[in-house]
Every structure is written in structure tokens, then in C-alpha cells.
Curated annotation (Swiss-Prot):
Catalytic activity: a plastoquinone + NADH + (n+1) H(+)(in) = a plastoquinol + NAD(+) + n H(+)(out); a plastoquinone + NADPH + (n+1) H(+)(in) = a plastoquinol + NADP(+) + n H(+)(out)
UniProt name for this protein: NAD(P)H-quinone oxidoreductase subunit 5, chloroplastic
Superkingdom to which the source organism belongs: Eukaryota
Keyword Calcium applies: no
InterPro entries for the chain: NADH_UbQ_OxRdtase_chlpt_su5_C, NADHpl_OxRdtase_5_subgr, ND/Mrp_TM, NU5C-like, Proton_antipo_N
Role noted for this protein: NDH shuttles electrons from NAD(P)H:plastoquinone, via FMN and iron-sulfur (Fe-S) centers, to quinones in the photosynthetic chain and possibly in a chloroplast respiratory chain. The immediate electron acceptor for the enzyme in this species is believed to be plastoquinone. Couples the redox reaction to proton translocation, and thus conserves the redox energy in a proton gradient.
Main location: plastid
Organism: Marchantia polymorpha (Common liverwort)
């Protein structure tokens, strides 16, 4: 058994080998490997399946009580400075290994069909394998230095995959935006790592927390400096997990292929930030101010993402802001000390969001032949509608993911989100109020997406007035039905259900979306009063107060407010965007007749639409204040450098040149001239002395 645990590094090694093999093939045998393009996906999927099976084995060993395993290779670089490379296998690691590998396998199977006709098919699988290997290496890392190495690899792979279609200007700009934004966070992360090494003398996670606690107990730590280091370190997860104010890269990342959007938003890049905060949780707990910053950052991010998602027209960007909001929930949970709830929501959200993104990919794939291949058309929900009758399996799986994300029992996210809502309310009512309000907004915008995409009539052939169509407001049919459009009967193209290869991952991901939440159900046995997930995670950190665990019926009773507000959001979405039943039409006509109400609704809807369209004006503020401000500052610096600094230097040179040119005529080689000049100067000197 010990020999098996010593080979945990095989888990990231297999996808890394797949990436290396495909990369070598593309570099040395580009023409030959393109003839066997299907073989490249088979290699990637097969190697990742091996890694997934190993991950399940290690996960099973951990939940059955096996001890935590650490294995390190050490190098003494300079005197007492030792660099250790290895792995750490504990319950948190084992859960993340299973999460990353299972989602990545489903994404790769899906990509085999989705990307089959793309010229970069093999390159895509090469990048995808490297991306997965980087994330697996990150979760296995036992220290901050190794985390930072794989952290940068994850960032590099995201840059390559977001800009995969780099010939499209929007994709090229999006990958640069993601890269630059994450550089800000990575710089802070590096400062935090170096700062904590200065304090504790260690990069190792276990030693770091232990030494920090000892120094804190003996009052040998400057708390201001330690807090500053923790905030710098937290800046890395803020950027990587798209937290306010470094969230601006996430919606632009939708320019990449849809399968990579699913992987980024479910189990890799954005999960890396949450994972690092969870790994550093024992240390952050000793700094209350930092925990407060984490919780408020999460709450603001959750609310901001939900409000921006309210009126998005782009299907993928709506889901992207949903991811931002749910990541805010996770960060909020970790900030209030609810370690288990935050990680539980990371797990449940990953499967639900992977299902939603892959479902959106199937929708986009079927819409492209009808409306065009540009994202402004194929991803625009205004051109969708009524897809349930053409894509029933995709619609059902998408509905399951939507119900889960809304927090409707018994779907997965209900159990994790409700625990976050209750714990945040008990911790601080204002945070709880923000969390509950955001839950209602989540239900509204998710069902808005579902209704606009799958319900009603198909709008893909309404091309008479594209501009008016694209300006659909938050109030849906209240204003949308005022416009009359004619069907282009010449067109015979209609959406089609995705093929079996693309449907298989959707059906498989539906299983954890429905059932994985049950691992967090609280139950009351004679020998245990905790849930399964808490029991597993307790092996690595005892951060959950079991005395506050509720019985199952009490838990369901406390869930009534969250479920009620979710249903309220769904009802509003149904009223505004749902199928137009006869009684709803009458109510909407009555509402439109009341001019005062109509004016209020229009003004409010315009505000929400502009808030969503301009992304809460944050991108515009960054563009005006930072980009334009920096360019203006550069112009000033350039002017000073060119005309003042260079002017002084060049002026001295010019003055010396002309001075030399003038004085050279004085020197003529005649002694009488020199004598006359000396006498004349002496005369002037004596005359000046006499006058003075």
C-alpha cells in the first residue's frame, strides 16, 4: 500500500505525458499525425481515464481512514535554505483529484465531437491535457513554491485556450486581458509567499501553520506585517477565482471554445483560487481581519455577479457571471469559517456548471448553421427559444443544472448553498441578507436563461429587425411582444439534437448534479452526528463545529426561507419570460395599461439593462482610469523625457559646441594678438575695480 501511495505523482503524470506525445507529434510529424487525429483524442482520454481511476483509489483510501501521506524530495540550495518538491495526499487533495479528473474526462469526450472539424483539433487536446495536468499538480502540491509553479502553468494554459481561435480579434484581446489581470494577482501571491517565508522560514503548508501559531502564541509576530502578507497572498485567489475587483477577465474568457469554458468554470482555473484559500485556511483563521476581508469580498462578488447576469443576452456570458456569483458564495463561506460548506459548494457547483456549459455548447453547436458562426449570433439568446422541442435531452439536462444552481431540493447545490446561507446569517446578518438576496437573483436569471433558450417559439429565423431583437429588455415579453416579426419561410434549417458523443457527458454529469448533494445531508446516528463530507475533511482540518450540527428535519425546516426565495425568483422569471399562457397575457395587458407602473418598470428595466450591458460600469472605469490614465501619464513622462531631460543634456552639448566654435577664432597663433587681448582684459578689470 505504501508503494502505491508513493506513486501518487502518476495522476498528473499521465495527462502530462499525453500532452507531451501530442506536442512532439505536432512539432516533428505535423502531416502524419493529422491523418490520425482521432487517435490523439483517444490517447488523451485514455491517459486521463487512468489518472481518474487512480484518483478514485486514493479517494477511497482516504475516506476509509488511511493516514495523510507526504513524500518529499529535498535539495539544499544554500546553507539552511532547502527546496522540497513532492506531494501531499489528504482528504482535500483526494476530493479535488476526483473532481478535476471526472469533469476533465467528460469535457474531453464532449470535445471529441465538438472540435472534430476544427483545424486545431490535435492542438486543442494537447493544451487540454496540459491544463488538466497543471491543475492536478497544483492540488497535490505540499508547499507554496510548488503551488506557484503549477499556478503559473494553469495561467499559461488558460491563456492558450482562451485565445485558441486567436485569428478572431475578440479572442486575442480576451486572452491578453485574462493574462494581464491574473498577473496582478500572481504578483501579490508571490509577495505573500515570500512574506510568510520571512516570518516562518518555511514554504510547507503544515509547517507554515504550525510555526505561525507558535510565533503568534509567544507574541513574536508583527500582526500588521502578517496581515499585509496574508492580503497579498489572497490577491492571487482573487484574480484566479474572478473575485471583485479582478473579475473582469472571466466573461471575456467565453471567447474560447465552449468545452474549455466548462473546464475553466467547473474544475480547474477558477477552482484553483478557492482551493488555495482552503489550503491556507488554518493560517487565515489566526488573522480575523483577513477572514473578514475574504468574507466581504465573497459577498460583494456574489451580489455583483448576480446583478450583472440579470439582463445578459449572450448565453455563455450569462453562465460566466453565474460562475462569478457562485465563487463569491464559496469565498464567503471560507471567510466566515465555514470550511466544509465552501468546499461542498465547490464540488456541487463544479458538476452543475460543467453540465450547464456543455449543454450551452450543444445549443450553440446547433444554432451556428442557422444564424451564423459569429458568437454575437450563435450565442445570442434572442435568436433562440423553443429549443426544447428540437433538443429534448439537452433541454432536460440543462433544466437539471438550472434547478441545481437555483438551490431547489433535492439537487446538489441546494444542500451546499443552503448551508452557506444559514451559516452566513448566523455569522453576521448583513452578510446573510446579501447571500439570501443573491439566491433569489440566481433563481431569476438562471430561469431567464432557460426560458429564453428552450421555451416559447423558435426565433432563429426572425431577421427582419436584428437591432430591435438584440435590445430585448429585462422585462421580457412585457416589451418584446410589442414588436412584430415575420418568419423567413424560405429557410428550412432548424436546430437538431446533439449527437450521442456530446449527449453522453451531459447524461453522465446529470447523475452527480442530482445525487452528489446527498453526501452532505446531516444525519443523527448514535455514534456520529456529522455528515460524510465533514467526516472526510476532518482528517485534515477540524474547522466545523459539530455541536452546532442540526438534525435532518431541523435542517429542512431552516431551508424553507432559501427555497422560498428561490421559487419567488423562478416565478418572476416565469411571468416575464415563460410560455405565454392566456391568463398571463391578460395580466400583462392589464399591467401595460397602467401608465404609471409602465413608466416605473421601463425606467427600472433600462437601468438594469444598462447595468448588465456595461458590466456594472467597472470595465469602463478601468478603461478610463487605468488604461487612459496610464497612457496620459506616459505621454507626460515622454514629454518630460524628450523636451526637459533630453533638452538639458542636448542643450549643454549644443552650448559647448557653439562656444567652442566661437572661441576657436581667438586663437590665431600671433603673440601680439594674445598680448593685446591680455592688456585689454586687464584694463577692463581695473576700470571695473575703480568704478566699484
Amino acid at each position: 500500500m505504501e508503494l502505491i501511495f508513493q506513486n501518487v505523482w502518476f495522476v498528473p503524470l499521465f495527462p502530462f505525458l499525453a500532452s507531451i506525445l501530442l506536442g512532439i507529434g505536432l512539432f516533428f510529424f505535423p502531416n502524419s499525425i493529422k491523418k490520425f487525429r482521432r487517435l490523439s483524442s483517444f490517447i488523451s482520454i485514455m491517459f486521463l481515464n487512468i489518472a481518474m481511476l487512480l484518483s478514485f483509489h486514493f479517494f477511497w483510501q482516504q475516506i476509509t481512514g488511511s493516514p495523510i501521506h507526504r513524500y518529499l524530495w529535498s535539495w539544499v540550495l544554500y546553507k539552511n535554505f532547502v527546496l522540497e518538491i513532492g506531494y501531499l495526499l489528504d482528504p482535500l487533495t483526494s476530493i479535488m483529484l476526483v473532481l478535476v479528473t471526472t469533469v476533465a474526462v467528460m469535457v474531453m469526450i464532449y470535445s471529441d465531437s465538438y472540435m472534430f472539424y476544427d483545424e486545431g483539433y490535435i492542438k486543442f487536446f494537447c493544451y487540454l491535457s496540459l491544463f488538466t495536468a497543471s491543475m492536478l499538480g497544483l492540488v497535490l502540491s505540499p508547499n507554496l513554491i510548488q503551488v506557484y509553479i503549477f499556478w503559473e502553468l494553469v495561467g499559461m494554459c488558460s491563456y492558450l485556450l482562451i485565445g485558441f481561435w486567436f485569428t478572431r480579434p475578440s479572442a486575442a484581446n480576451a486572452c491578453q486581458k485574462a493574462f494581464v489581470t491574473n498577473r496582478i494577482g500572481d504578483f501579490g501571491l508571490l509577495l505573500g509567499i515570500l512574506g510568510f517565508y520571512w516570518i516562518t522560514g518555511s514554504f510547507d503548508f503544515q509547517q507554515l501553520s504550525k510555526r505561525f501559531f507558535e510565533l503568534l502564541s509567544y507574541n513574536q509576530i508583527n500582526l500588521v506585517f502578517a496581515t499585509l502578507c496574508a492580503l497579498f497572498l489572497f490577491l492571487g485567489p482573487v484574480a484566479k477565482s474572478a473575485q471583485f475587483p479582478l473579475h473582469i477577465w472571466l466573461p471575456d474568457a467565453m471567447e474560447g471554445p465552449t468545452p474549455i469554458s466548462a473546464l475553466i468554470h467547473a474544475a480547474t482555473m477558477v477552482a484553483a483560487g478557492i482551493f488555495l484559500v482552503a489550503r491556507m485556511f488554518p493560517l487565515f483563521q489566526m488573522l480575523p481581519f483577513v477572514m473578514s476581508i475574504i468574507s466581504w469580498t465573497g459577498a460583494i462578488t456574489a451580489l455583483l455577479g448576480a446583478t450583472i447576469a440579470l439582463a445578459q443576452k449572450d448565453l455563455k456570458k450569462g453562465l460566466a457571471y453565474s460562475t462569478m456569483s457562485q465563487l463569491g458564495y464559496m469565498m464567503l463561506a471560507l471567510g466566515i469559517g465555514s470550511y466544509k460548506a465552501g468546499l461542498f459548494h465547490l464540488i456541487t457547483h463544479a458538476y452543475s456548471k460543467a453540465l450547464l456549459f456543455l449543454g450551452s455548447g450543444s445549443v450553440i453547436h446547433s444554432m451556428e448553421p442557422i444564424v451564423g458562426y459569429h458568437p454575437n449570433k450563435s450565442q445570442n439568446m434572442i435568436f433562440m427559444g423553443g429549443l426544447r422541442q428540437y433538443m429534448p435531452i439537452t433541454a432536460i439536462t440543462f433544466l437539471f443544472g438550472t434547478l441545481s444552481l437555483c438551490g431547489i431540493p433535492p439537487f446538489a447545490c441546494f444542500w451546499s448553498k443552503d448551508e452557506i446561507l444559514v451559516n452566513s446569517w448566523l455569522h453576521f446578518p448583513i452578510l446573510g441578507s446579501i447571500a439570501f438576496f443573491t439566491a433569489g437573483l440566481t433563481a431569476f436569471y438562471m430561469f431567464r436563461i432557460y426560458f429564453l433558450t428552450f421555451e416559447g417559439d423558435f426565433r432563429g429565423h426572425f431577421f427582419d429587425d436584428v437591432k430591435k431583437l438584440s435590445s430585448i429588455s429585462i422585462w421580457g415579453s412585457l416589451e418584446f411582444n410589442k414588436e412584430q416579426f415575420k418568419l423567413d419561410k424560405k429557410s428550412t434549417l432548424y436546430p437538431k439534437e446533439a449527437n450521442n458523443i456530446m449527449l453522453f457527458p451531459l447524461i453522465i454529469l446529470t447523475i452527480p448534479t442530482v445525487f452528489i448533494g446527498f453526501i452532505g445531508i446531516l444525519f443523527d446516528e448514535n455514534k456520529m452526528n456529522v455528515d460524510s463530507l465533514s467526516y472526510w475533511l476532518t482528517l485534515s482540518i477540524n474547522s466545523f463545529n459539530y455541536s452546532n450540527s442540526e438534525k435532518f428535519l431541523e435542517f429542512l425546516f431552516n431551508a424553507i426561507p432559501s427555497v422560498s426565495i428561490a421559487f419567488f425568483g423562478i416565478l418572476i422569471a416565469f411571468y416575464l419570460y415563460g410560455p405565454n399562457f392566456s391568463f398571463l397575457k391578460k395580466e400583462k395587458k392589464k399591467l401595460q395599461l397602467k401608465s404609471e407602473i409602465d413608466i416605473v418598470l421601463k425606467s427600472f428595466s433600462n437601468f438594469i439593462y444598462n447595468w448588465s450591458y456595461y458590466r456594472a460600469y467597472i470595465d469602463g472605469f478601468y478603461s478610463s482610469f487605468f488604461i487612459k490614465g496610464l497612457r496620459f501619464l506616459i505621454k507626460i513622462v515622454s514629454f518630460i523625457d524628450r523636451w526637459i531631460i533630453d533638452g538639458i543634456i542636448n542643450g549643454i552639448g549644443i552650448f559647448s559646441f557653439f562656444g567652442g566654435e566661437s572661441l576657436k577664432y581667438i586663437e590665431g597663433g600671433r603673440i601680439s594678438s594674445y598680448l593685446f587681448f591680455i592688456i585689454f582684459c586687464m584694463f577692463l578689470f581695473f576700470l571695473y575695480s575703480y568704478i566699484i
